[in-house]
């Protein structure tokens, strides 16, 4: 059984893949700009492209990427192939392209969360986002809120990712007072002076994400064929 360091039960969804494929595309866009003699710093590049995603169609205009650099146990893949597919009448714009890659970055995670939220009746008051996905303010946060249909909060430390969270757990084990719960320690010792920003899910984004996921699940056979035939 998985628990927090103070013994509280944990429901955990783990996915293998997230933004590796998206990062590869961002680097391709950087290479394209540099071919024209344009230099752009990393934060500006990511910020501009991530924010572009907010201009896209709610369902990503019919685009379908998979970010499977490796296998994904949630969808029963032992190997992965990053790929991008569309139909002739898909709305192939930069905004939809970026939006679809942000959506698919948490696609497998959403499938796992749907089991907890829709099948097992788990109720989420809010999520606290950490990691590079949330580094561009408001974008990954808005996408995640749509994915889980729940408010998502981020703090200034959001970009620090998992290593920061692990350090907090270690600090709790070392510094907690007798009987002090992890929740109390985090609230009173760690987050008391930290400002957070919360974004509620936009119903149109939620509906769009569900439509994207219908396409995602239907297209898994495309990914499976790529694993078999692309070497």
Regions found by a protein language model. Give the residues of each.
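Active-site core segments that coordinate phosphate-bearing ligands/cofactors
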Residues: 1-128, 133-231
């Amino acid at each position: 059984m998985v628990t927090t360091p103070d013994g509280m039960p944990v429901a955990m969804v783990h996915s293998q893949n997230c933004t590796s494929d998206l990062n590869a595309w961002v680097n391709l866009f950087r290479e394209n700009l540099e071919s024209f003699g344009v230099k752009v710093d990393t934060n500006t590049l990511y910020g501009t492209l991530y924010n572009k995603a907010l201009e896209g169609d709610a369902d990503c205009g019919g685009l379908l990427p998979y970010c499977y650099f490796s296998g994904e146990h949630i969808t029963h893949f032992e190997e992965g192939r990053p790929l991008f597919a569309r139909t002739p009448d898909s709305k192939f714009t930069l905004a939809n392209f970026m939006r679809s890659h942000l959506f698919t970055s948490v696609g497998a995670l959403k499938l796992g969360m749907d089991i907890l939220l829709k099948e097992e009746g788990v109720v989420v008051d809010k999520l606290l986002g950490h990691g590079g996905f949330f580094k561009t303010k408001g974008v990954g946060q808005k996408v995640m809120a749509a994915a889980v249909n729940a408010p998502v909060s981020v703090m200034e430390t959001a970009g620090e990712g998992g290593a920061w969270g692990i350090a907090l757990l270690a600090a709790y084990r070392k510094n907690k007072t007798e009987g002090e719960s992890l929740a109390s320690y985090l609230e009173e010792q760690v987050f008391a002076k930290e400002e957070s920003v919360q974004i509620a899910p936009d119903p149109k984004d939620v509906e769009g994400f569900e439509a994207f996921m219908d396409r995602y699940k239907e297209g898994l056979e495309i990914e499976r064929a790529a694993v078999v035939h692309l070497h």
